[in-house]
Amino acid sequence: MAELNTHVNVKEKIYAVRSVVPNKSNNEIVLVLQQFDFNVDKAVQAFVDGSAIQVLKEWSMTGKKKNNKRKRSKSKQHQGNKDAKDKGERPEVGPLQPQAPLVQNGHMNGCEKDSSSPDSAREKLALTPREKKISILEEPPRAQRGITEGSRLLQQKMSLDGNPKAIHGPSERSDGLQWSAGQPCNPSKPKAKTSPVKSNAPAAHLEIKPDELAKKRGPNIEKSVKDLQRCTVSLTRYRVMIKEEVDSSVKKIKAAFAELHNCIIDKEVSLMAEMDKVKEEAMDILTARQKKAEELKRLTDLASQMAEMQLAELRAEIKHFVSERKYDEELGKAARFSCDIEQLKAQILICGEITHPKNNYSSRTPCSSLLPLLNTHAVASGKQGNFSRKSSGHNKPNEGKAANPKMVSGLPSTADACQQTMPTNKQQNGPSNQRRRFNPQYHNRLNGPAKSQGSGNEADPMVKSNNRHEHRRQPHNGFRPKNKGGAKNQEAPLGTKAPEAPPHSEKARRRQHAADNLETRPFRGNVGRVSQCNLCPTRIEVSTEATVLSVPAVTLVA
């Protein structure tokens, strides 16, 4: 019962791992659990981190797992003791059989049937690497069979709850396990029983195959891809560095010129203050000279009272004062600002320096065998871009095509609108003429039904409507259209007559064309509609009030 509880615990651990990783098969979960000594947390962490893929690769590729030798030896010793007990109970399973690599209890390359003692396990571990390589090269199908049998063995462990025959004690279960472990080693046994399990094992093997093929196909290109990725990431970093350098340089430029500006302002302030001082000093000197001149002038006024010696002294003073007038002129020019602006501008222009980037990159011409691939990729990307543009641009012609029938179908409605607009304008402009004179068409309309009997009775409604339209198309004296020539040329084929025609001629024309109007009515209506559409743009500005006001005019005439 203890071993049964162990299997139940294994199944519960499988379910616990599957609840976290639902897209993994039972075989993969069991192999990873065996790798981590059925520790659920470590197995789940391995699936999450992706290290479970490497574990599964080690299970699928025989002879590659080199660690855990101590663990293997201990498990083999334990299995050897267990097999010795089984041999004592069932001696018929005793003969040795050829070994095949089998996945069992977390280690590889061992058939537990032969390991009757710990010495045999140690002998197996003492194989040289060369012998291991030879065994791997000579027996690849056996390795696959070992993986298949290992997965089948694990499935048997999981199905212990549903199989009542398996619960009879540890001896029978161990015999069943030994039989399943010994089956791939015996070539004479039939392989039909292992067919249901073989369908799952190659699938797991095929999942690992593309990665191995990719590694075998281009081990060097992976290093190049990593180098390219590092270089690409560094380009992004350098781009950020350029932006940072530009920002810092801009700040430095602003700071430098702000300092220059402050220096210039300070110099300007100092020069202005100095100029004020110069002005004040010059004014003081001139004021003193002015006082001296005033004093000499006052002395000259007193010259009549002076002695000869005093007059001589006064003349000498005046002569000295006058002789210094050249200094007065220099004093007037003393308040002058001078600056070598050109030299300063040249110094400012050469102030500051910016280093430009140097394009030291060299272009390498690709090999002739690589050019077709590059051209094909470029053409494919170009076609894809053009296809996306065309697909986005195909909607516009369809919209245009869809809009054309609407425009075509809108022509009759426009013609009808024009036809309705023209009579409205004529009725709006011509009620005064209709009230002033006798209109023979309305007179004939009132007397027509009594005179036309027999065959004329069928055509009377058409004739009335035709006369009504003809009267609406008839120009009046009060309305002068802008295109007189066009109106005359277009209304002449319609058979419209001037209102001065006598009544009997209008009656004769109506009787003559009464029968023809039944057949020619659609054609004439269309012609009239087109002709009115040609005149429509000049009369398109019609308000709703004009349409309402035109109705009483027709009613009054009728």
Swiss-Prot record:
Q: Locate the compositionally biased regions of type Basic residues.
A: 63-79, 469-485
Q: Where is the composition biased (Basic and acidic residues)?
A: 80-92, 110-142
- Disordered, as annotated region: 63-148, 161-202, 383-514
Q: Keyword annotations for this protein? A: Acetylation, Coiled coil, Cytoplasm, Nucleus, Phosphoprotein
Question: Which sequence positions carry the modification called N-acetylalanine?
Answer: A2
Bias class Polar residues marks the residues at 416-433
* Keyword RNA-binding belongs to the record: no
List, alphabetically, the GO terms of the cellular component aspect.
cytoplasm; nucleolus
Coiled-coil segments = 279-344
The UniProt entry, under InterPro entries, shows: SPATS2-like, UBA-like_sf
The family this protein is said to belong to: Belongs to the SPATS2 family.
What is the protein name given in its UniProt record? SPATS2-like protein
Say which species the protein is native to.
Rattus norvegicus
